[in-house]
Amino acid sequence: VVSMGQTNNDSDKVDEALQKVWMHELADRRIGDLSGGQQQRVFIAKALVNSPKILVLDEPVTGVDVHNKDLFFQILSELNSKEKISVIWSSHDLDAVERLANKVACLNKTLFFHGISQEFFNDEEMMKKYSETSMQMHMHHH
């Protein structure tokens, strides 16, 4: 599923990318036969083949079941910590953002907060402003 458009020389990169997102065992399956969460992991693997320094994801777990959602976030955390890949993603899931974010950017037509995740979650005024906003989570490797 990831190797589309890649040469034979890239097969090792494809295998490595699939292992990083825990999809190696399903490498021979068609993308349409995979669950939504599995498909998201394949899309991440496809990006990993090119050795990115940053992944930018828009609501990556929308419609994904709870098990695959947790697995997806665990994979993103590992990519951040082990592979030194910065991950920026948009989310309205405050629980996930609070558990995983190093930094938070909160937008509601303008940027009204950008800083350390815990500062945001400890600020009652910020939490009130959050309603009807778009939040972006950042996992930076420093």
Regions found by a protein language model. Give the residues of each.
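Conserved ABC ATPase "signature" region
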Residues: 9-26
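Conserved ABC ATPase signature
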Residues: 30-34, 38
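Conserved catalytic motifs of ABC-family nucleotide-binding domains
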Residues: 51
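Catalytic Walker B motif of ABC-type/P-loop ATPase nucleotide-binding domains
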Residues: 55-58
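H-loop/switch region of ABC-family ATPase nucleotide-binding domains
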Residues: 91-92
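A short, surface-exposed alpha-helical micro-motif characterized by mixed small hydrophobic
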Residues: 97-99
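Conserved beta-strand-loop-alpha-helix hinge in the C-terminal portion
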Residues: 110-132
